[in-house]
Amino acid sequence: MRLISISTTIAFGFAFQAQAATELQWWHAMTGANNEMIEELTKEFNESQSTYKVVPVFKGTYPETLNAGIAAFRSKQPPAIIQVFDAGSGTMMAAEGAIVPAAEILQKGGFTFDKSQYLPGIVAYYSKPDGTMLSFPYNSSSPILYYNKDAFQKAGLNVDNPPKTWPEVFEAAKKIKTSGAAPCGMTSTWLTWIQTENFAAWNNVPYGTNENGLGGTDVKLQINAPLYVEHFQAIADLAKDGAFRYGGRTSEAKQLFTSGECAILTESSGGLGDIAKSGVNYGIGQLPYYEGHGPQNTIPGGASLWVFAGKSDEEYKGVAEFFNFLSQTEIQAKLHQVSGYMPVTMAAYEETKKSGFYEKNPGRETPLLQMMGKAPTENSKGVRLVNLPQVRDILNEEFEAMLSGQQDAKTALDKAVERGNAAIAAAISN
């Protein structure tokens, strides 16, 4: 009887432990070094307590993850947390009843939410007009310029002074190509996010009407204005000569840089982890601009964490605990310093500065200085469309036709505006 009693007690003990750990699925789109960071952070959180277990689940690219989340919600089987890229923010904000604001989640969990503790530009981007933070900004980034120092030296370019304006970048790309310093002068990830949305903000020109969508959903695109045409025609001309090489619609072009094929890359600061691991002798510069227009301020990219409605109070408490964990200064500082993403709290930023990290790692403060250097204007607060992922797809189709020589920049941008405006109008009416 005693043996039965002991075994029964053990069995009940294990059952209790299994029930006590409330599982919280976190769907995400991170790969490479950034996926390693997610695994490390969730392991650290899970080991810090025994009540909740966060389970990270990779769901593909940013658009694929968003689509998977939408489908899961419709089938009433959503995860507790989903990582949604910046372009999907408008879609999530418009889905009333499908999400619970992050600020509300933190308050439900017994935590005091003080938005003054967070970087203002990041919090504002993921908040309602009344200031309510809707999602937790996990991996916010800013586009910057990376350059291959060895290729610059071979081409006779200044290794310690990367080009600052777009005309200077284009000239450097030509010189790199013609000198044979690298097979390709330059490339860029995310032509939509970097070369249109951030291009607008950084050069203080409108992307669309109605404050780029922040003032209302009825938006008319303005990305066929003369400065855009000049910029994209210059890129198209470089592509004809092979000085610019197209890598793909999202972050694929990063491989062209890490392989040594292209010597200049405009990419998210969040791409730093993979670039650092590649062994390329790289330098960092600010995002290029046009004289007389920029630099103004960049807008956040990357992604934030959204919480689906329909979960239990216990699950929401667990999510609040996890968000609070991610907000800790040491966690934010580590995420920033290892990945290149920006810290979301002022305390983590100040801690990183005090540690001397930026002095030891030149260029690493650049994303933050770009975003916070100037107060935003109507052109540089951000872009918020109810169907921004769809509009990006339209732009990418026209850019790809341009880069393959099927049309010039003006035709590509005119068609993108016409098609994009029609898609926005249809999305609003639906």
From Swiss-Prot:
Disulfide bonds: none annotated. Keywords: Periplasm, Plasmid, Signal, Transport. Coiled coil: none annotated. Pfam families: SBP_bac_8. Sn-glycerol 3-phosphate binds at Y62, D86, S141, S268, G302, Y341, R392. One of its GO terms (cellular component) is periplasmic space. Residues 1-20 form the signal peptide. It is found in: Periplasm. Part of the ABC transporter complex UgpBAEC involved in sn-glycerol-3-phosphate (G3P) import. Binds G3P. Belongs to the bacterial solute-binding protein 1 family. The complex is composed of two ATP-binding proteins (UgpC), two transmembrane proteins (UgpA and UgpE) and a solute-binding protein (UgpB). This is sn-glycerol-3-phosphate-binding periplasmic protein UgpB.
